[in-house]
């Protein structure tokens, strides 16, 4: 069986800056895969390249058996792959109600039964129908991120790209959103690719991970190896030290 997502020798260049350098990863169906590294390491750029939001200068992306080159993505792709961004307020139109925000992807993809789907999506992320006609500024940060997750889920994708989905939230809310995401992944049998600078989060959420530095993958390991401190690169050890609250098993 082919991987749910496979990236082969992917490169992204902005002007003369190499944001990604021949990056390769393979994520299996139903797996939660982590990308970690310091700011500017290329982890978010990799997600954006997969989503068609960054210019690809070399390499290829495979979704199941479909090969993607360049940055153009089809409706079929966005039905299968959705992205949740770091800043929930910035990713939600401030002048649209939650109802409108959730209706838009359904309209784009020609999906019927919008009322039922919107109600079900809000219920799945722990928000009731009472939130349906509110605006983003009327919600807390955690509630806005739940709406962003509902918007991604409403078209029933098989892969979620999660770009630091809890880093903009208060610590007390982070655990709630992470537990929600994990429950959704198990219930829907989704594939996750999660970017985080917090190794504790990745150990909790992901089975395997790739460590990135200066646009390249420098180490690959399982979450068990990371938790046990069985790492090979000094850079990875420094990331462990920098992750406050990270405790080895």
Predicted features and spans:
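Conserved ABC ATPase signature
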Residues: 135-139, 143
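Helix-to-loop junction immediately C-terminal to a conserved catalytic motif
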Residues: 51
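C-terminal boundary and immediately downstream tail of ABC-type ATPase nucleotide-binding domains
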Residues: 228-249
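Conserved ABC ATPase "signature" region
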Residues: 115-130, 241
């Amino acid at each position: 069986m082919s991987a749910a997502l496979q990236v082969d020798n992917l490169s992204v260049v902005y002007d003369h800056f190499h944001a990604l350098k021949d990056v390769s990863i393979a994520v299996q169906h139903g797996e939660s895969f982590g990308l970690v590294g310091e700011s500017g390491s290329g982890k978010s750029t990799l997600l954006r390249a997969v989503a068609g939001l960054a210019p690809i200068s070399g390499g290829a992306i495979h979704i199941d058996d479909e090969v993607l080159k360049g940055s153009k993505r089809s409706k079929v792709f966005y039905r299968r792959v959705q992205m949740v961004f770091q800043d929930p307020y910035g990713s939600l139109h401030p002048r649209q109600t939650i109802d409108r925000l959730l209706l838009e992807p359904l309209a784009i993809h020609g999906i019927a039964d919008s009322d039922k789907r919107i109600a079900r999506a809000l219920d799945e992320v722990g928000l009731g129908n009472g939130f349906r006609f509110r605006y983003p500024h009327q919600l807390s940060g955690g509630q806005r991120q739940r709406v962003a997750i509902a918007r991604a889920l409403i078209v029933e994708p098989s892969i979620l790209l999660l770009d630091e989905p809890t880093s903009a939230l208060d610590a007390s809310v982070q655990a709630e959103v992470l537990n929600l995401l994990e429950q959704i992944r198990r219930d829907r049998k989704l594939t996750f690719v999660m970017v985080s600078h917090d190794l504790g989060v990745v150990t909790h959420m992901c089975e395997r991970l790739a460590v990135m530095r200066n646009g390249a993958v420098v180490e690959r390991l399982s979450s068990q190896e990371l938790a046990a401190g069985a790492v090979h690169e000094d850079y990875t050890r420094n990331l462990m030290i920098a992750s406050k609250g990270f405790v080895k098993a």
